Amino acid sequence: MNEMLRAIEQEQLKNEVPNFGPGDTVKVHVRIIEGKRERIQVFEGVVLKRQGGGARETFTVRKMSFNVGVERTFPVHSPKIEKIEVTRKGKVRRAKLNYLRGRVGKAAKIKEARNK
């Protein structure tokens, strides 16, 4: 039974998921259906956390929209996600950046990671 579940879960995984983590700025291209029309909506923000594993893995992205914080949680391997672009690598020391919720302006900025 366990091998069967693992095989089904393996089919659900996407191959082209980029390497990203908390602190990175990403653009998530989401497929949205409005009535009979289908379009791509881009959600750009900072990754707060990445949790779970396999087909159930999710990540949370936070952005500021008209001075209001907007957070959205996406399944990594969702068929509704067209693609994920990493725009900026961030340098952080935590796996979960929940402390950013209480910060505004310059205090909410994350340093950019330097390439080695």
From Swiss-Prot:
GO BP, one example?
A: translation
An example of a Pfam family matching this protein is Ribosomal_L19
Q: Which UniProt keywords apply?
A: Ribonucleoprotein, Ribosomal protein
Does the keyword field hold Acetylation?
A: no
Q: Which GO terms describe its molecular function?
A: structural constituent of ribosome
Q: Which parts form a coiled-coil structure per UniProt? A: none
Where does the source fall among the domains of life? Bacteria
Q: Name one GO cellular component term.
A: cytosolic large ribosomal subunit
Q: Ribonucleoprotein as a keyword?
A: yes
Q: Which PANTHER family match?
A: LARGE RIBOSOMAL SUBUNIT PROTEIN BL19M, RIBOSOMAL PROTEIN L19
What does the UniProt record say this protein does? This protein is located at the 30S-50S ribosomal subunit interface and may play a role in the structure and function of the aminoacyl-tRNA binding site.
Q: Which family does it belong to?
A: Belongs to the bacterial ribosomal protein bL19 family.
Q: Which HAMAP family match?
A: Ribosomal_bL19
Q: What is this protein called?
A: Large ribosomal subunit protein bL19
Gene assigned in the entry: rplS
